[in-house]
Amino acid sequence: KNKHQLNYDDLKKLITEKTKLIIINSPSNPTGSVTAKDDISKIYELCREKGIFILSDEIYSRSVFKDQGEFYSPSMIDHCNNNVLILNGFSKAFAMTGWRIGVAIGPKHLIEKMGLLLQTVNSCVPPFIQKAAIEAINGDQSAVRMMTEEYSKRRKVLVNGLNSIEGIRCHMPSGSIYAFPNISGLGMTGEEFVDLM
């Protein structure tokens, strides 16, 4: 009913004294929705007031379709100095799937703790992957734009095709590589639908 958009008032009601972190995934996996700038700003203010951290998963931040709005990061407010932590990677935008390289940006004390944890989990990302990641970020971005344009075309074909099937409704995703159809009009469970496919 709300195109998979986060409802700020509902979120606010769920926060208790135990809430330490809110995760924002925009563009979203699996719905493809992009959280609006106004909602990001309200969530940031709420979290700042209550001493809650925001972890913003921005793996699809470069995959927002031009006709569907813009991506907005809470880091634009906080610059990752206080209560915002950004996670991003190279697998989606730069087709570096399986290379296992990403980036975390946040308050110094959190990044230091993450670094200690990472030392025990993963000894080292191979140097050639690190160099490729630097080139991906600093180099020509035309391939990223071309991929996003192609995904936008495919998204339209997929969603229009899904919506042409009686009993299926699907909102046009704003970003990422996902579509999230509602099959409730088919009168079957998700498992039954998958088995039928």
PLM feature segments, named:
Residues 1-197:
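PLP-dependent class I/II
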